[in-house]
Amino acid sequence: MNLFDQFLTPSLLGISLLMPALLMTTILLLNPKNQWLSHPTTTIKSWFINQAAKQIMTPINPTGHKHSLILISLLILLSLTNLLGLLPYTFTPTTQLSMNMAIALPLWLVTVLIGLRTQPTTSLAHLLPEGTPMLLIPILILIETISLLIRPIALGVRLTANLTAGHLLIQLISIATLNLWFMMPPLSLLTSTVLILLLLLEFAVAMIQAYVFVLLLSLYLQENS
């Protein structure tokens, strides 16, 4: 059995199920209508969104707050997708590098274009630190340009690598627990405990990675707004 088979995009009758997997997360965000009192889940979602918006939008200038809707929506999408991927017999779209790059590259490019449109001089000045010696100017400009172009790649690879590593560890320990259950039951109880702790850790990682992804985008936006 190949451990990486779980990361293959599922299909039905030759049709990819990647988009339905993403759209399924929106079901959890639908609020019931015609209710006098708010549902507890609605209250929890509202509190989570308010806290996330406060943390993400704090470093951004007031002029950049108009982009808060897309940042918060992206945070909710990534969080729910990562968490649902930890359930048995589910598919995690965010383990696909192609999808993460498709999200990171356009949003990073938007932050760069916003900076070039609103304050082109300041945006280009980021490529050359103040007080740089004359001989080092070409080298530093090249280094800063490369570091700028690497940002979307780092965003996509970071999210993919962390989620993929967690899923592989869970699968390896699950296989070990299942095999030890018939050969050494006492030892299988120990590995089961490790598996439960790892699952709790992965739930935290799923939330943290979504938050880090959006927070870095907000910092890029703040740098160019």
Swiss-Prot record:
GO annotation, biological process: proton motive force-driven ATP synthesis; proton transmembrane transport
A GO term from the CC aspect: proton-transporting ATP synthase complex
Annotated transmembrane regions: 10-30, 69-89, 96-116, 135-155, 168-188, 194-214
InterPro entries xrefs: ATP_synth_F0_asu (IPR000568), ATP_synth_F0_asu_AS (IPR023011), ATP_synth_F0_asu_bact/mt (IPR045083), F0_ATP_A_sf (IPR035908)
Catalytic activity: H(+)(in) = H(+)(out)
Top-level division of the source organism's lineage: Eukaryota
Subcellular location: Mitochondrion inner membrane
Principal cellular location given in the protein's record: mitochondrion
Known role: Subunit a, of the mitochondrial membrane ATP synthase complex (F(1)F(0) ATP synthase or Complex V) that produces ATP from ADP in the presence of a proton gradient across the membrane which is generated by electron transport complexes of the respiratory chain. ATP synthase complex consist of a soluble F(1) head domain - the catalytic core - and a membrane F(1) domain - the membrane proton channel. These two domains are linked by a central stalk rotating inside the F(1) region and a stationary peripheral stalk.
Name of this chain's protein: ATP synthase F(0) complex subunit a
Upper classification of the organism: Eukaryota, Metazoa, Chordata, Craniata, Vertebrata
Encoding gene per record: MT-ATP6
